[in-house]
UniProtKB/Swiss-Prot annotation:
Organism for this UniProt entry: Thermoproteus tenax
Full protein name: 2-dehydro-3-deoxygluconokinase
GO biological process: phosphorylation
Gene3D superfamilies listed in its UniProt record: 3.40.1190.20
Family per similarity comment: Belongs to the carbohydrate kinase PfkB family.
Domain of life: Archaea
Active-site residues, Swiss-Prot/TrEMBL: D272
Residues that bind ATP: N179, I180, R181, K240, L241, G242, A243, E244, G245, G269, A270, G271, D272
EC number: 2.7.1.45
Length: 325
């Protein structure tokens, strides 16, 4: 197994691939000061949500990315659409739903565990949870190089779950981030059933971590996890280890990328940065080791600020960080 820093393989491809992500964009209210939210006086507002973050990361890495979603007919919904459009994401398939509000969540930082954040959601009955199969444009799906979603979207509602199944059933290629959020599921058995059901479509790139894999497969070891995921039809596995780094396993090889040592302001969004960056580069033909190097660098920049996606770099900026550290 290769380890450490790697500059092998092609530079980020010039050919632009087309991706579609399906999931809920949210408004994030991030505590300006660390500690319990009951004593926080000021919050910063950011646009976030796993698939929205994925799209911005993929766009920064050189892909085209369209988001299928719903937002409320409110100021937060308009904020999301305008912000994503400004970041280069195609929002022509984001519908405005007058019957439900835009979802929000709060970020509690560095409490009770320093260096970690806790997320408190207010998204039940949100516009984003009402996305369904009718929102999935078959012509958009068939024209895309790959479709991406997450375990979060599967958990939102029955209609959102069915939307993912429709999109994955029509997609040329599929990428998926397990992203198990226990607070969104009735129990972990339900999460396991729903995610394994989606993996049956055959996933080209799976992004996950030991905690989610323990729930799904009952194992934590990276190599054992890859063997079991391969049996389920997964082609390439990105296995995140948080502050330690990440593995990538593919047909014929494996590689470990150590994490970059940076000051952590808020780790929220780091995994989405890895997913979007890696998928965009890897599916465009970049060597998986090179793609993971740049994806880990992108995530290192994300955790240094509040907000999930404002610090996402260009490949040149990610490379500059790799050379500096």
């Amino acid at each position: 197994m290769a380890e450490g820093r790697c500059s092998q393989g092609k530079e980020p491809a010039e050919a632009m691939i087309s991706l579609v992500a399906l999931g809920e964009p949210l408004i994030q209210l991030n505590a300006v000061t660390p500690g319990p939210l009951r004593y926080v006086a000021y919050f910063e507002k950011h646009v976030a949500g796993s698939e929205a973050n994925f799209c911005i990361a993929a766009t920064m890495a050189g892909a085209r990315c369209s988001l299928i979603a719903r937002v409320g007919d409110d100021e937060f919904g308009r904020n999301i659409v305008e912000y994503l459009r400004g970041r280069g994401v195609d929002v022509s398939h984001v519908k405005v739903d007058p019957g439900a509000p835009t979802g929000i969540y709060f970020v509690q930082r560095h409490f009770p565990v320093p260096g970690r954040s806790r997320l408190i959601y207010y998204r039940k009955g949100s516009a984003g949870s009402r996305v369904g199969p009718d929102d999935v444009d078959s012509s958009l799906i068939s024209s895309a190089d790959a479709v991406h979603s997450t375990g979060i979207t599967l958990a939102l509602s029955d209609s959102a779950n069915r939307a993912v199944h429709k999109a994955f059933g029509e997609a040329k290629r599929r990428t998926f981030d397990t992203n198990i959020r226990p607070a969104l599921w009735p129990d972990l058995a339900a999460a396991r059933r729903a995610i394994l059901d989606v993996l049956n479509y055959g996933v080209d790139v799976l992004v996950t971590d030991p905690d989610d894999t323990q729930i799904l497969l009952g194992v934590r070891d990276p190599e054992e996890a890859y063997r079991k995921y391969r049996e389920l039809g997964v082609q390439t596995l990105v296995y995140k280890l948080g502050a330690e780094g990440a593995y990538v396993f593919w047909n014929g090889g494996s590689y470990f990328r150590d994490a970059l040592k940076v000051a952590v302001e808020d780790p929220t969004g780091a995994g989405d940065a890895v997913a979007g960056y890696f998928v965009a580069l890897y599916l465009s033909g970049v060597d998986p080791r090179r793609a993971l190097d740049l994806a880990v660098a992108a995530s290192a920049l994300v955790v240094g600020v509040r907000g999930d996606n404002e610090a996402l770099p260009s490949p040149r900026e990610a490379e500059e960080l790799l050379k500096a550290l």
